[in-house]
Amino acid sequence: MTEVKVAVTIAPEQELSQSTIDDLIQFQDSIDIIELRIDQWTNLNEIAIEKVVEDLQSLKLNKKLLVTYRTSNQGGLGDFGEDDYIQILRKIANCQNIDMLDIEFDQTRSLNILQELIELAHKNQVQVVLSHHNFKETPKLEALKHLFYKMQQLESDYIKVAVMPHGKQDVLNLLNAMSDTADVVSQHVVGIAMSKIGLISRTAQGVFGGSISYGCLDTPKAPGQIHVSTLKKQLSMYE
C-alpha cells in the first residue's frame, strides 16, 4: 500500500485571512502539503504570489507548498488563454520557496511546451503535479488507462487524474486505472473520483496506489472534498 500525503486546498483572495492562518495552525498535524489556488485572483502577478508564499513561510509549518492555477476548462475559475496560462506557470516555476507546481495536461496542448515547463520547474528544484480534470464524466476504463499512459510519458513527479462519476462503475474504473498505472510507472500517481459517491477514492487512496489525497479547511474547493482532520483519520485506518 502506498503512503498517502494529505494536501489541504486553500483559495485566499489575494492575501491570507486570519481564519485561514488559524486553521492551518490548528490542523497542521493533519496536513503534509498546502495547495495554494490562485486562479480566483483578479489581479494575478508574481509579486502577489510571492507575497502570499512569504506569508505562508512565516508560519513555519514546515509543509510542502503546491501552487495551482486551475483553468475554467478543467473546472477552475481561471480565464487565462493558452499563452497567458503558460506564462504564469513559467513565473510560478521561477518563484522562491515553492516546492510543487500543478501543470494541466490537455490533449490539445503541445507536449513540447509541457515538457519545457516540467524541465524549468525541475531546474528550480520544484516538483511537478501533471494533472487532468474532467468535471463532466468518467471516461471508460481503457480511455482512463490510456490517459494515464500519455501523461506518464512526460517527466513529471506526479500524474493526477480527477473525474466526475455518475455511478459506482465509474468509481471502480477510476480506481482500477489508478491501481494498474501505479504498478508500472515510476511517477507518483493520484486518482480522484469527485463528489460524494467517489469519496472512497479519497479515503482509500493508498490501497489503490495513490499518493496524495486532497482535503479542505472549510468550504470544499472541489466536489467531494472533506475536512483534512477527517481525511487524515480515514487514511490512518489503512495503515
From Swiss-Prot:
GO molecular function term, any single one: 3-dehydroquinate dehydratase activity
Cross-referenced InterPro entries: Aldolase_TIM, DHquinase_I, Type-I_3-dehydroquinase
Role, per record: Involved in the third step of the chorismate pathway, which leads to the biosynthesis of aromatic amino acids. Catalyzes the cis-dehydration of 3-dehydroquinate (DHQ) and introduces the first double bond of the aromatic ring to yield 3-dehydroshikimate.
Keyword Chaperone: no
Entry annotation: catalytic residues: H133, K160
Organism field: Staphylococcus saprophyticus subsp. saprophyticus (strain ATCC 15305 / DSM 20229 / NCIMB 8711 / NCTC 7292 / S-41)
Recorded family membership: Belongs to the type-I 3-dehydroquinase family.
Keyword Amino-acid biosynthesis: yes
Entry EC no(s): 4.2.1.10
EC category: lyase
Reaction catalysed by this enzyme: 3-dehydroquinate = 3-dehydroshikimate + H2O
Binding-site positions, 3-dehydroquinate: E35, L36, R37, R70, R202, Q225
Name the UniProt record assigns to this protein: 3-dehydroquinate dehydratase
BP terms from Gene Ontology: 3,4-dihydroxybenzoate biosynthetic process; amino acid biosynthetic process; aromatic amino acid family biosynthetic process; chorismate biosynthetic process
Subunit structure and binding partners: Homodimer.
Pathway, per record: Metabolic intermediate biosynthesis; chorismate biosynthesis; chorismate from D-erythrose 4-phosphate and phosphoenolpyruvate: step 3/7
